[in-house]
Curated annotation (Swiss-Prot):
The gene is pstB1. ATP binds at G57, P58, S59, G60, S61, G62, K63, S64. It is an enzyme of class 7 (translocase). PROSITE patterns: ABC_TRANSPORTER_1 (PS00211), ABC_TRANSPORTER_2 (PS50893), PSTB (PS51238). It comes from Lactiplantibacillus plantarum (strain ATCC BAA-793 / NCIMB 8826 / WCFS1) (Lactobacillus plantarum). Pfam families: ABC_tran (PF00005). GO terms for molecular function: ATP binding; ATP hydrolysis activity; ATPase-coupled phosphate ion transmembrane transporter activity. This is Phosphate import ATP-binding protein PstB 1. GO terms for biological process: phosphate ion transmembrane transport. The complex is composed of two ATP-binding proteins (PstB), two transmembrane proteins (PstC and PstA) and a solute-binding protein (PstS). It is found in: Cell membrane. Belongs to the ABC transporter superfamily. Phosphate importer (TC 3.A.1.7) family. CDD domains: ABC_PstB_phosphate_transporter. Part of the ABC transporter complex PstSACB involved in phosphate import. Responsible for energy coupling to the transport system.
């Protein structure tokens, strides 16, 4: 018997078996407008499951706008046309439960944004909002999430301390732990290491490489070295268009588009 408490979005997502599909998320004929200004005019991409895909390009090229469209973070400020396909659903359609969809497509922002709560509560708070109140369950998920974000050994004895007392790199990894606590399929990251020092950046990269065993990861970065180190695929954006998308090794050693080569080699602009 169907669970009548489930939304249509929940039922459709649960009915789709991702094991039968290599593509976790795709966009078709995607266009994004801020008023009359078109920020994305050619945004057709497919993201393979359990891979890291990097979105690169100059400032203002549209890569962050594109990323934020993937879980409809732009809904209030932009008009998005075209299809965003996830588990057989066009999640850009009006009948999608956006709140439920975001449980499956998580987001980590450029600057760490921990809650003004304890380390433990930063993760447990969202779980309680979803009806999970049993302490044993909360404890297990908090520990699992912190372990996956490579933080558990650093904070296991300080879970009741304020998250605001953590270093910038630790705060960002806590935000990653918070995002994965509800076990999304896909993790979106908008320049997650741009405000961090090299050591913290390396720790974030190592964390993402571990996480891709269980998550599909899409990351915006201005750091070419970072893209080449951690991503399996790279898309080059310019002026709101995806000019090239291929395996990262191919993009960095044998780009097919002159502008891609210019950007990677530092001769762009």
């Amino acid at each position: 018997m169907a669970d009548n408490t489930m939304t249509t979005t929940q039922r459709n997502i649960m009915a789709f078996d991702p094991k039968d599909h290599e593509i976790a998320l795709s966009t078709e004929d995607l266009h994004v407008f801020y008023g009359k200004s078109e920020a994305i005019s050619e945004g057709d991409l497919q993201f393979e499951r359990y891979k890291i895909s990097a979105l690169i390009g100059p400032s203002g090229s549209g890569k962050s706008t594109y990323l934020r469209s993937l879980n409809r973070m732009n809904d209030r400020i932009a008009t998005v046309k075209g299809k965003i396909m996830y588990r057989g659903l066009d999640i850009n359609s009006n009948d999608i439960d956006v709140y439920e969809m975001r449980r499956h497509i998580g987001m980590v922002f450029q600057r760490p944004n921990p809650f003004a709560k304890s380390i433990y509560e930063n993760i447990a708070f969202a779980l309680r909002q979803r009806g999970m109140n049993k302490k044993q369950d909360l404890d297990e998920i908090v520990e699992r999430s912190l372990r996956q974000a490579a933080m558990w050994d650093q904070v296991k004895d300080d879970l009741n301390k304020s998250a605001l007392a953590l270093s910038g790199g630790q705060q960002q990894r806590l935000c990653i732990a918070r995002a994965i606590a509800i076990k999304p399929d896909i993790l979106l990251l908008d320049e997650p290491a741009s405000a961090l020092d090299p050591v913290s950046t390396s720790q974030i990269e190592d964390t993402l490489l571990e996480l891709k065993q269980n998550y599909t990861i899409i990351i915006v970065t201005h750091n070419m070295q970072q893209a080449s180190r951690i991503s399996d695929y790279t898309a080059f954006f310019n002026l709101g268009k995806v000019l090239e998308y291929s395996e990262t090794g191919e993009i960095f050693t044998n780009p097919q588009v002159d502008l891609t080569n210019d950007y990677i080699s530092g001769n762009f602009g």
